[in-house]
Each structure stands twice: as structure tokens, then as C-alpha cells.
Amino acid sequence: MALRNTVDFLLYDWLKVDQLNQRVRFADHSRETFDAALDTCERIARDKYAPFNRTVDTQEPAFDGEKVILPACTQDAHDAYVQSGMLSAAQDYDIGGMQLPYTVEAAANAFFACASVSIGGGMLTVGNANLLMKHGSALQQEVFALNEFNGRFAGTMCLSEPQAGSSLSDVATRATPDGDDHASDPFGPRYRLKGNKMWISTGDHELTENIIHLVLAKIPGADGKTIAGTKGISLFIVPKKLVSPQGQLTGERNDVALAGLNHKLGWRGTVNTLLNFGEGKYPVRGATGAVGYLVGEAGKGLQCMFHMMNEARIGVGLAATMLGMAGYYASLDYAKTRTQGRPVGPAGKDPSQPPVRLIEHADIKRMLLAQKAYGEGALALGLYCASLVDELHTGDEAQQHQAQWLLEVLTPIVKSWPSEWCLEGNSLAIQIHGGYGYTRDFPVEQYWRDQRLNMIHEGTHGIQAMDLLGRKVLLEDGRGLKLLGERMQTTISLALDHSHRERSDAIHLQAHALALRQAVQNITEATQAAWAGGEPAVALANAVPYMQAFGHTVIAWVWLQVAMSSQGEGDANLGRRQACQFFFHYELPKISAWLNVVKSRDSTCADMPEAAF
């Protein structure tokens, strides 16, 4: 119930999500319908996910040469998720959706991630289908996207290759027109693809009737050459099994072959694959090459894929958050029951006294408070960003523009900050368990292993940082950064006003508001200083410290808002106020060191000769 109470507070007391039913799209909804969705997901997560988190970690996917073998619990969890309707939760009624706000959908999915982050792959299927609903043709939407929303098909995103991980401009997969009639295929221009795709999550399995791959590839010109860089990349639908325009399987296997499984540190319940496209293992109509259908315009594939990637980045941030929360809950339970050591009194420790529980030690409280501040702060940010998606889709014109610009600058943060700091939280959860935490007798080591992926996939930490400092804060003369700064200044003013009206915690709110004001000023100065010379290589050399400081400032802003909404009586409100105070006292001061190297354009790292390592 601890997670549910936190989710309810953030949704209803802070974000006021129940007021969304004043908008036409959500007019049929109320807190009652939102709670029903949350109840269903909480129950399925408790019954079908949580009991099998260790099972999917120890019984990794296996390949028997023909198909992927998964434990039975994975199929059960998948089926329960499909039956819940969550794959199409935010979609229109007329295509089987519930028209739930994305904020509620994200909160509901948090229960699954907390119970077992790797047992389900719904995020990729939904992202795949959403991309097609935005960029696909009417028939592509009807046959592929709608069958993903109803759970009949699954979806993937195929970007990386063995030689090109994050460097998408170097993709070597090629797409050539499939016959003289390729342009007249009902599904869109038809091509044959040849190449390899690496690190493809849910790339092969038997959980669904079919798998729909969205694949990035380049189309050679008449001279056989491709356009250099990302401008020449196109996007294709490549089904594992071919489908008729009526949506039925034709009985033909497409030329997509599983080359092998990647055996990972964590996140082991999710199949991760190397796929070969067009190698000839499954020739189609007597010819090699995987059949694929162009999505959108040729050469515009990366722009289409970014729609899915941005959704995936918010999803990764929420997954990272829930792993942090899972570790927090586990270590909190352990600290409440494990006895160890004696308290320090005026005369030191008294060995005649019985040992006390871990939670009675100040340093254990420090580690628990850190986890609470990281996890609940990240969850608040994730749900806030989800609410911006709702603004983007249902707000008036001004609200939509503001939501778009805020999401531009916050998406790198909502992905990267939980990935880094909830990983630290998981490390602290192990520390609280002591030696037991380092064993497989307790779940915290698995949470850490699962968590370690999140700084890598869907855009590495460094790439997120360069995207933030190198692009997002500069767009349209820093429009998004300025808007975020205005939102923060509004919160600061409210907090200062709040501190004069409330009898409790007034001095803390005032101090926090002033500290946030200084942090915002420091971020602004660092942004300007980094680009003072106008040289990208110099400015971006310290992009990660910049992102760390930026993220800490954003989380401080979020915590200040949460604290102002937690001024009532009760342990939960006190806990949130204490977590806010911890963050401002122990975490926010760190930004000075990070920003010092940004402001001075420190070149220590960039200047280090290779031979000196």
C-alpha cells in the first residue's frame, strides 16, 4: 500500500489529475474510473508479476535453434496485462481504448515496473503502435497498430547494429525496392532489407501471434551509394510473419532470423536479441531479403522513430524510478526488523543493552532518506512529465505549446536522472542489508543489476547530456529553458508566500525557495558560460556534470512543490517534508562542484592524451 498511497497523493493531491475530466476527451472519467484502473494494475502486478521476479531472473530466455523458450509465468503475466486493456489504455474508444489520461496510464504501469521490471515488454509494443498512429498509412494503422493495441501482435524498435550502437548515422542495413510493382503494395512502398540489428528487446518470442519490427535502414541511390549521416535513414515495418491486407497471417515466414540471445547482467526476463534481416534463412517467394514497408517519407525515418524514442525515454525513467522504489521498500522493511548494534548515548555505547533495529541508527536513516528522496522525487517528475503529455494532446493552443517546450528540456532529465540516482539508491539498499544484500537471498542485488541498464539503453547517459546542453536548452534562443525557469520562479514565489502563512515548516520552505532561486541562477549562468566561446567541443566536454546539476535543480523544484502540498498532519506528510529537506540539505549543494567545471569550460578530460591513461 505504500506505493499506492504515494501514487494517490501525487495524482490527486498534487497534480489534481481528477480535474482532467473537465476536458472533452476525459469527460466520461472520474476518480472512480481512475482508481479502478489503478486497482486492476496493482492487483495484476501483485499476483502475476511480483511472485515471479526472481524466476525470470534465474530462468533466462533460451533459444533451442528454432524458437525462444520462456518460463510459463511470462506468458501468464503477458496475457493478464493484455486482458487488463493497458496496451490501449490511452487510445480512442472506437479502436478499443479507454481514453485514460497518459498520467493515469503511467501511474498504473508503475505497479508493474515495481513488481518485476523485466517480465513484460508492453512499453515497446505501445510505443511502436503509437508511432504508426502518427506516421503510418491508414492500412498500416488498421492492420499493424490496432493489432498491437489489442495484444495480438507485439512490437519492437530496431535501431542499433553490432558496429553502430548509438551512432545511428553509421547503420549498414540496406533497403532496396522489391520488384517493379513495389510502389503499389497496399501497405506502402515495399522493400527488401538486408542487415543485422543488435540489442533488440523482445526481438523474438512466442508470446504473441506475430512481432512487428520497426527497422531503420538506408535506401541506396541509383549509383548504389547512400546519403551520409542520418538524413538518409528511412523507417520500415518488417513483420516476423507476413500479413495480408485483411490482417490475417499468410502462412509465410519473413526473412528475419534470430541469430542469438544476449545474456545480460540484469533485466533478464526480457528477451534481448541479435536479428539478421535478409540472410536467406527464410526466403520469401524464393528470394532473400526481409520484406518491409516504408513508413512515412524516405529519408525521414529518424524523425519518425524519435516519436517512439521519446516515449521510450519517459518509460525508461519510470522503470528506473520503480526499481529505486522497490529497493527502498525492501531495505526499509529490512531496517525495521533487523537488529544490529547499540545506540550511542551520552557515555558512548552500553554493551549491556540489547541491540536495536537498524532503523534506529542515524546513518541508516540517512540512506533510507536518500532512497526516498531519489525515488519519490523521480516518480513525481515522471508523473509531471506524463501530465505534460496530456496537456500536449488535450490542452488549448497555449498549453500545448508550453507543454511541448517543457518536454523538450525535461525528457533528457526524466530519462537520465532516475537512471543515475535510483541506481545510487539501489546501491544504498544493498548497503543497508550489509553482507546479506550482496547475496541472492534478498532481492536488492537484483534491483541493482536490473537498474544498471537504464543509463545505457534508449540513449546513453552521455548522449542525453549532449542532447540537453547541445540542443534542448538552445532551441529557439532557449525558449524551453526560459519557460522552465519561469515555472520554477512561480513555485519559488508561492513557497515564499506559503512560508508566511503556514505555522509549521515556514523557515524551511523559505530557505528551500531561496536555495532553489540560487540554483536556477547558477544553471542559467553555467549555460551561458559553456557556450561563451561558441565551440561545441569545448561546451559539451562537461555536458554530464551540467546535466547532473540541471537534474538536481529540477528535482529540487519538484520536491518544493510536493512539500507545499504536504503541509497537513500525519506521518506521510511529515515524511515528504523531511525528504524535501534532505534533498535541499544533502543533495542540492552538490551542483556547485558540477557547475564549476562547466562555467570554467574545464578541459581536464578533453585534454587528457590517450597515452597517459
Label every model-predicted segment.
Residues 376-414, 527-541, 562-571:
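C-terminal helix-coil-helix/basic helical segment that borders enzyme active sites and/or dimer interfaces
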Residues 1-119, 139, 143, 603-613:
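Amphipathic, small/basic residue-rich leader segments at the start of a protein or domain
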Residues 475, 491-613:
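C-terminal amphipathic alpha-helical interaction region
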Residues 189-253:
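A short core secondary-structure module
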Residues 90-101, 117-120, 317-324, 420-439, ...:
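Conserved phosphate/anionic-ligand binding catalytic regions in large, soluble enzymes, centered on
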Residues 61, 124-125, 136-189, 196, ...:
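Internal maturation/activation junctions in enzymes
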Residues 242-259, 264, 271-312, 332-359, ...:
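A glycine-rich, basic-preceded beta-loop-alpha segment at the flavin cofactor/substrate interface
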Residues 192, 267, 384, 405-483, ...:
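Alpha-helix capping/hinge segments and adjacent helical runs
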